[in-house]
From Swiss-Prot, chain B:
Gene giving rise to this polypeptide: mrps-24
Biological process terms in GO annotation: mitochondrial translation
Predominant location category: mitochondrion
Protein name: Small ribosomal subunit protein uS3m
Transit peptide residue numbers: 1-23
Coiled coil regions, renumbered to chain: none
Species assigned in the record: Caenorhabditis elegans
GO CC entries: mitochondrial small ribosomal subunit
Keywords per UniProt: Mitochondrion, Ribonucleoprotein, Ribosomal protein, Transit peptide
Amino acid sequence: MHRLTHVSTRNRSSLAEKLRNAVGGQDFGKAKQIVAGGSIAVKDEHGEDFRELYVMPKRKLRGQTQLEQATGRTEYKTRSRFDLMDRLTKRPPRSEEMDPEAQKWCDVWPAARTFASSVVPLPVRMGTRPNVEKRAPFKKEGNLELVKIPNFLHLTPPAIQQHCQAIKKFCTPFPPELLSNPSATCQHLPISIEYSTYIHQGTSIRDIRSRVVTMKIHVAELKLSENQMEKLIRLAANRYDEKTGKMTIITDRCHTRQQNLDYAHYLLTVLYHEAQKVEKWDELKNRTDALKVEFDGSNTKTKLIDLLEKAKLTPGLSPSAAGCGDQKSIDEFGEMWKAYRNSEETVEKTREYGRQMKKLLGIQQ
Amino acid sequence: MLRSIQHVEALSSRQISTTSMLLKNRAGKTKSTSNRTQLLTYEMAQKPHHIGVRKSWLTWHSQNLEEFRQSQPLVVAQDEVVRRFIRGFFPQNLVVSGNEIVIKRRGNVLIVAGFLQYSRRLDIRRIYWMFGFAEEFLSILLKQPVKLEMAFVESEEDVAYNYI
């Protein structure tokens, strides 16, 4: 930003004086005239004449002609500029010529471009001033700040509308089933694939991060039996999210996105078929090997049924509420019990446990 | 022993010599003239610590973003090549010695923006030819499309923000 300017001034210029003398320097002093005229009056230190070398040019110098013009001694023909034709053909700014109401701005500014003050008919200003009331911010013409910033003059609402109209023929309607029922997405589209495309400046469009593919599968849509599902979940390990019921496969070991996508599909196929296999050791599976603690076959269930039967047989103890202790209420309790045993214990869950137990045994709440 | 005594004597006569501070920080400092003829553009008038606040950058690209630093040194070198070429190719038309040339990168396109002046000579055909040559030359040199979006102003006074 810092600019050095070397301004040299000739303090003892004899040329100017000589010119003044040549034009009409009669009123100068005698001594000055002698010196200016290149006389031999000046002696050097050896006492010899100091002959100053001065060669007057044959043409008249600029200062001389200017002085002659000013004093009216001679008339000079005024010549037009040598680039006059170019200056005449220069167009006035387009923003002054255009009618902003009538013309289409999309045709004037069709694509992203650096701000051009001669084209944009907006009275914009940009830049700071210490005191804006005294002096307005920097004008539009010659404003580098306006040139620097990216503008969105090619993205006016009519331009976007025009673009949308143009690409509409390539679009297909959104599935009406999903519009009416958004929760059916996982049923109709059980597999979703995510990847990122990185756009940045440079001569190379490659970005190594774009190879990563994330595949999410809604496991319930694989139509597996209970045992197969358990096997799939065990094989998938931490890739399976129990809350959402989705399995996530992230592949990034191949170089291209397509390869990674193929690999993800391959992994899914392998998992599916592996889950369907029944091995010999599958029969050895015990109750303790299950992923979840089951109500069926648990000690609680046997003890509970035993208790309920004893209560029925006891003549003095008749269940107060109707239907307590039957199969339906036991199943209901079993569901609650399973949820209670297989999740983190909270105060609410414990209270719910107590409530259900009272209901089952027909005790007054 | 004797030598060490002499040494101590010499030490006792010594003093800490101090000089005035050399204030060498010159960035963004402008020297004013008595008759207010020194032209200042907006870029010059704003201090370096105002970059990003009052004035923006002269180079725009994505290589200085986090996680996108793939070829930052290349970009810096390219910028210098472009700036030097423009300075050398349009010596008659430069504004403030060609210090304020904006280089923007969009996709694989390199855009050179800024201001040029035609106060000395306006030769429209020549300018068109030079623009075409510069674009073509830089495109071949940098192996990517280069666009010149430089605007012309009448003279250097048109870009003057202030005179000091």
